[in-house]
Curated annotation (Swiss-Prot):
Reported function: The glycine cleavage system catalyzes the degradation of glycine.
Family the entry assigns: Belongs to the GcvT family.
One GO CC annotation: glycine cleavage complex
Keywords assigned: Aminotransferase, Transferase
Description of how the protein assembles with itself and partners: The glycine cleavage system is composed of four proteins: P, T, L and H.
Enzyme nomenclature, EC number: 2.1.2.10
Catalysed transformations (reactions): N(6)-[(R)-S(8)-aminomethyldihydrolipoyl]-L-lysyl-[protein] + (6S)-5,6,7,8-tetrahydrofolate = N(6)-[(R)-dihydrolipoyl]-L-lysyl-[protein] + (6R)-5,10-methylene-5,6,7,8-tetrahydrofolate + NH4(+)
GO BP annotations, alphabetical order: glycine decarboxylation via glycine cleavage system
Record-given protein name: Aminomethyltransferase
Gene this chain is encoded by: gcvT
Keyword hit for Secreted: no
Organism: Chloroherpeton thalassium (strain ATCC 35110 / GB-78)
GO terms of molecular function: aminomethyltransferase activity; transaminase activity
Domain of life: Bacteria
Length: 362
């Protein structure tokens, strides 16, 4: 089992700890509903140090990432980030990731914890030459997310960086508690907030300082349970649920980060083909009853014929009703289409709805 540099803090806080991607991580502290509400209404603090960090630099780094990822690396300016995908040749998803441009031919990637080794191996397999340097920095860096409408007010107590000047999906390097930190206006909750990346040895100090500065604002530590309900309300994909090696970006409603016009990239031909012949599509749905849809449950039509499968589901703390995502035959993907979730042998009526389930301003 692996541990993040903040593991002792989670133990001291009495967090319920679970195995996630080989890390012992907090799934909740005071409860998923309390933590979810705090992020939507005030501010929450997340340890996401289990995520992976890679550095890509050297002559040819831009061209390398342009070939490896679906989004247009050429469009990045210094200090800007983009959401993107790594694909296999058949269009299946290796992983989703964030690509940060630090400087010309110098990039920083954040990948999913469950895919660190796989992703790094995939990049190494396609490394063009020794001029492009790939470095896996996952074991030396920590990642803390501060999210919610009061996140900026809290973080501003600990840094001289003008946070209001950092636009959405932009970042700067600056001092937090006097320690060099990558400060990025990004997140996985739909709320305003920042993700902070720092050397492991500074993580505890920064965490404690954020908690102390956040007490007047109602800050709470937030576990992976609420992280999941928050992301699901926004319709954000989670690797292993909405996307995996068998899903194509166009099926997963990720055509907006798949830039077919940019030139060649791994998986492009499969994406071109899939865009023309979409047999299944990822949709969001709400249920009329109280039962919660779970990953793997069948989605059926009224006659009981299989038309798809559930990817994720939860009782939305904000909406107060069950929501979910799933793949359905494209003919059932229109908004307001009636579908049925087979929950323990009983068909529960659901309606396809527009995603995100919530509309937030960041």
């Amino acid at each position: 089992m692996k541990y993040t540099p903040l593991h002792k803090i989670h133990q001291q806080l009495g967090a319920k700890l679970v195995d996630f991607a080989g890390f012992e991580m907090p799934v909740q502290y005071d409860g998923i509903l309390v933590e979810h509400k705090a992020v939507r209404e005030a501010v929450g603090l997340f340890d996401v140090s289990h995520m992976g960090e890679f550095e890509v630099k050297g002559k040819g780094a831009k061209a390398f990432l342009q070939n490896m990822t679906t989004n247009d690396v050429e469009s990045l300016c210094d200090g800007k980030a983009q959401y993107s995908l790594l694909l296999y040749e058949d269009g299946g998803v290796v992983d989703d990731l964030l690509v940060y441009k630090i400087a010309d031919e110098h990039y920083f990637l954040i990948v999913n914890a469950s895919n660190i080794e796989k992703d790094f191996d995939w990049l190494k397999q396609h490394q063009p030459d020794d001029e492009v340097v790939l470095e896996n920095r996952s074991d030396e860096l920590s990642l803390i997310a501060i999210q919610g409408p009061k996140a900026e007010a809290v973080l501003s107590k600990l840094t001289d960086v003008p946070l209001d000047a950092i636009k959405y999906y932009h970042f700067v390097f600056g001092d937090v508690c006097g320690k060099r930190t990558l400060i990025s206006r990004t997140g996985y909750t739909g709320e305003a907030g920042f993700e902070l990346c720092m050397a492991n040895e500074h993580a505890e100090e920064i965490w404690h300082a954020l908690i102390e500065a956040g007490l007047p604002f109602g800050i709470v530590p937030v576990g992976l349970g609420a992280r999941d309900t928050l992301r699901l309300e926004m319709g954000y994909s989670l690797y292993g649920h909405e996307i995996d090696h068998q899903t194509n970006p166009y099926e997963a409603q990720l055509g907006w980060i798949t830039k077919l016009q940019k030139g060649d990239f791994i998986g492009k031909n499969a994406c071109v083909e899939k865009k023309l012949h979409l047999e299944q599509t990822l949709v969001g749905f709400t249920l009329t009853g109280k039962n919660i849809p779970r990953q793997g449950y069948k989605i059926q039509d009224l006659s009981g014929t299989d038309i798809g499968v559930v990817c994720s589901g939860t009782l939305s703390p904000t909406l107060g009703k069950p929501i979910g995502t799933g793949y359905v035959k494209s003919s059932f993907s229109k908004i307001d289409s009636k579908v049925y979730i087979n929950i323990r042998g009983k068909l529960q009526e659901a309606a396809v709805v527009k995603v995100p389930f919530l509309h937030k301003n960041r």
